[in-house]
Amino acid sequence: MAGARQPLRVGQIITGDTGHRYRIDGALDGGGFGVVYRAARLAQTSDRVVRHVCVKVCASAADWHGEAHMGNLLAGRREVVEIVDAFAFGTGSRGVTRYVIVSELMREGTVGDLVDDPEWHGWPPARVRRELRDLLGVLKLMHAAGVTHRDIKPTNVFLRDGRLALGDFGIAKHSLTPGGSSLDAYTPAYMPADVDQYRHWGTWLDIYQVGLLACTLLTGRDWTNDDVSRIRDLTAPDDLKCWIWHATAARGLRYVDGTAALEAIGSLRAVDMGGTRGPASLRDQRVVVTGRFETGTQDELRDLIEDAGGVVQSAVSDDTSVLVRAHQIDNTVGGFEGRKLFSVRERKRRGQTIHVIDEHRLCRLVGLSPV
């Protein structure tokens, strides 16, 4: 950290191992993982500016090694910020070592900058879905190679030509085993509330952060862990809300890595949640009901279903076979309604056979005349 605490001066020229020279033009940002400067790469034999870049003095040698490694690993990917140079140099009478990462200058800023703009109110769902697919494509490659980013938040997701690019790999980790990536550095606001219960960083935690990012992109405001309970109130297609719900699920049918999350976001729209004829009888069927019914209360329907030989479940499970969906889904009563519908959509996507029937079909199955 000592190198990061010793600021570079405006006008100072630093030289990398390859001989490239960089002039410091001003400070951009500073935090716990390093200090960032706006800079210019100069010509070899003059002070002519060849390219405007970003210079980051890392907080530690470990952070520097990690970020340089990730830059090489993901070189050439449009969806990440390009690393153009990495080197260490010593300055001052005490020879303080600075660990430097040079990256492309992202002139359009970050998603965090968009959030700070009062005129920005988010993107249309189609655009959000497209950008998420691209980010998840990168995470699919990273997770398959044992790499986790660990700090996906609005200020670390940049824009280039209006498209998202993942940056700041300062605390990313490369591990050969799932237990090899300790849970040591993270931003609490973008982590599950029960994060202290986990000893190691799982790939699903990266997906959790992408789920929060999706909410930010849809609404134009910074979503943190405190906002997860409001996901079903988002103005977005049901399949996208379902994806976000499972991406941010602390347990249950969450997406374990980039591969699973990418597959889900591309296939949830094809899941048919419309009413079907369903089974010929409710006998031995495991039934979940959701919504506000005209025929009676859910307790009254429970009795009718059980009289018809069915088993009523309070939540969707591995053996659920029927979902009874009311014409009116009341989003103001409890949190179960959203969870049941989202869970059924995801389970159907994974291949579980669940019949979705409406109130009229239920009435016929229990021997009532529809209201």
Model regions and ranges:
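Activation segment signature within eukaryotic-like protein kinase domains
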Residues: 131-132
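Interaction modules related to DNA damage response and DNA replication/repair
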Residues: 278-371
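Catalytic-loop of the protein kinase fold
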Residues: 143-159
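ATP-binding glycine-rich loop module of kinase domains
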Residues: 39-65
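Short beta-strand micro-motifs within the conserved protein kinase catalytic domain, predominantly
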Residues: 82-99
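Conserved short submotifs of the Hanks-type protein kinase catalytic core
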Residues: 94-110
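Conserved activation segment of eukaryotic-like protein kinases, specifically the C-terminal portion
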Residues: 181-195
